[in-house]
Amino acid sequence: QAEFNFKEDYTAYLPYTTNDKQPMPMAFQNVYDITPLSKAQPKLAFLPVTVDCGSVKLTLLESDLEAYPGVFVQSQQGKYGLKGVFAPYPAKTDFYPWRKQEYVTETTDFISRSRGSRSYPWRVLAITEKDTDMPVNNLVYALASPNRIGDTSWIKTGKVAWDWWNDWNLKGVPFKAGINMDTYKYYIDFASRNG
């Protein structure tokens, strides 16, 4: 159980989940709702979440989260706080063939199944005095597991095209656009021509 209680009705920055019927399986993408804690919607919000406490900002986030459920937060209606909500462990799953994605159809009453020794995620409360301190706070990196892939010097920033966007947006080509080899080849050739 996790609760985050505050002494006043501070302003919270909450990115709510986008599916009210099944709030946990999501893309973790949304705009932030800026609201007093007492007026926060009863929906689940995903991390990071920031609470402006006046002289400092407190940001809830996670580090080293692998093969374990992340925490969501939910308003404690009418109170100045947020409570942690954890995704239950899947009992049964099914498969969306068109998305090549597994989804949960039934859950258990526990959050994880684990064997042997392992590390567990860090739940982090990062406190900053200025907004400019937020993006340079390295606490999440310091708490994370060490690099397991070795040399990363070959990784460069750049542009990307995702499968689901390829399927929706590619027009005027001599093949059926979609999540298929012709679409991937087209994007590879385009990238090669345009650097």
Q: How should these model regions be labeled?
A:
Residues 1-147:
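N-terminal accessory beta-strand-rich subdomains and adjacent acidic, glycine-rich linkers
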Residues 111-194:
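An acidic-aromatic substrate-binding cleft motif
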